[in-house]
Structure formats: C-alpha cells, structure tokens
Amino acid sequence: MIISSEIVSAEEFCNFVKDIGGYIPHLGASRGGVDKGESSVWLGLLDEDMIHEMYSDRDVAEWEAKLGAAPQIIVELRLDHSPRAKLLYLWVAFIFGTKWNSILYDVNGELLSYAQVSGRYQEFGVEW
C-alpha cells in the first residue's frame, strides 16, 4: 500500500488513475485499476478516518516517522498473479511519489521510502 502525508481528494485520486492510463469503474468512485499487458493492479483510496479505524496506533506512528508527517491517506494496492504485477505496482508507487510525499509498504512487508521505491523501479529500466 502507498501511504501519504498529503491529503488527496477522491477527484485528485481518480484523475491520477486516469492520467496513468487506468480506469475508474464509475463516476465518483475512490477506487480503480491499471492494466498493462497481462498485469493488473487494483487501487483503493482510504482517508485518514479509515486509517485510524483499520490500523493500529503503532503502525501509524511507524509510518509517520518514515514520512516525516502524519499519514493522511492510504492507497491500497491489490495485484494479480502475473509475472510482471509486482513491477506494475512498483511503477504505480513510483509515479504516485512524483506527485505526493509517500512511502510504500510493499508486498514483502517492507516499509520503503520514496527514494527506495525509485531506486528499485529504476533498476528494472522498464517504461510503461
């Protein structure tokens, strides 16, 4: 999941998803997806209230320390099982981080700064 210290409205989120070639299932939704080749990533926006309902104070404090500010939103990411799905979700996190201060809690349970996300993505040298 992507964790950001910036407030991202549902409209901004939807525009982001569409700008990267993704889709929104219906007007006003705060979820969508991105398909590239045979890989898909589903994205869902959670606001600050949902963060505190769904996650422990300890988790939130850890994210705040890594972000340098309190988390305001989470973008949940769900991947398919295709060979390049992890690369696609890393690309989504990389592009998101160019717009908003963020970190990534990756599929291996590791908390990555944007610099680490950027480095890992650039290692692959893939352009979508």
Residue ranges of model-derived segments:
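Acidic (Asp/Glu-rich) sequence patches and key acidic residues
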Residues: 1-128
